Amino acid sequence: MQPNSTVANDETLLYFSRAWKLGMQPNALLDHPDLQQVQIEGLLAIFLLALGHVNRAWRICGIAIRSATAMGLNLRSESNYVTLPSKESRYKVWWSLYTLETILGNMTGRPLNLDSDFCTTPLPVPFEEHEYNEAEVIRIMTDHKTRNNLLAHVITRPVGEMPAAGDVQSVRNAMDILNPNMALYFVCYVDLTRIMREIVETLYAPEIVQNSARDAEAAITDANAKLEKWLSKLPAGFRIVEEGGGGGGSLVTHDRYSLSLALHYYSATILACKPCLHYFDKPSSSSSGDSSFYTYVAASCVQAACRMLDLFPAEFDGTWLNQVAPWWCMLHYTVQATAVLLIDFSLCHPGSIPEASIQALEKAASWLNEMARIDLASRRACVVCGALLAKLSGVVGNRAGVAEEAVGSRSEVGLYR
């Protein structure tokens, strides 16, 4: 996000056109893809996502996934001609596209196309590339059972063979040299993304509406159990810390890695609990569902939204946004939390809304206002949220109002649809 959105937009479009000319040759879609072409297509999708062109990013990501599948990146490499570092690079490319498709699918509400049943690509080893020459790391990269035994200590479920009693000493040696780093962060992020995809498939597929209330409750309970398991396995260096205690303190993260994982975790929690927010989906007293369950899960959803916003600084901080936060999807996180609060407020009676929720909505509105000044996609989101807030003025009053001069005209904000 840049202070002058018009100038920044012109510059980024210029860079994008150059990248497109260089990377997407006239026959790029007809030629057999190679690893470099897959990376180019994936980077173009990320670039479009960062610009706010989510629909275009979703389409290009689909092309990249097709190219990767054509290369067999969705399968574990058994080739003797591919070096171990090259295999790890291919694994990272595949899981990067996997996470990117999940993010874009959640943003657009479109179905996810990758089927886990057709994927045997193992998660990459949680070590930096400069450690690939160490004996223990080489052993883990070579032996898939040892790899899974190691990963079982930091993720909920490895890919491929389930962990079994193996070389315990190798795993212990590897754990001794395993430190929080970008590779370990990526493994934890992918593991959480896999849970998020399961949540989408079990709770948001159109055919799910045919399931009974008990089936929905079981799916939601299972999803939250998996999220809690993921959180319990998260390495200590990536965990968020609560200051103040008693469940009412502010949340503090150590660095960009822990902040990104925390935001992703609360986003997944919102996805798992959000079905219970909708008033008309709650079972009546005569149905088989338990209304107390829906009330509890709905409260958990609102709490996750408040916790997500609690990770933001009290006042808008452009430096924090660009240098610490995962800026490429911060608008999504902000709007996701705001939407939860707006839905909850629409179902509440005036005067019954907790003060903490109102403060969270005020904070979200303040951040959207400031982001709208420097980013056109944020400006459009600010217009939409402002219109919804206006309809809820009888419930929340003007405390969370969005300043009209900060959002711009509707014709201007349509650029990033």
What are the residue ranges of the model-derived segments?
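Conserved, structured regulatory domains from eukaryotic proteins
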Residues: 129-131
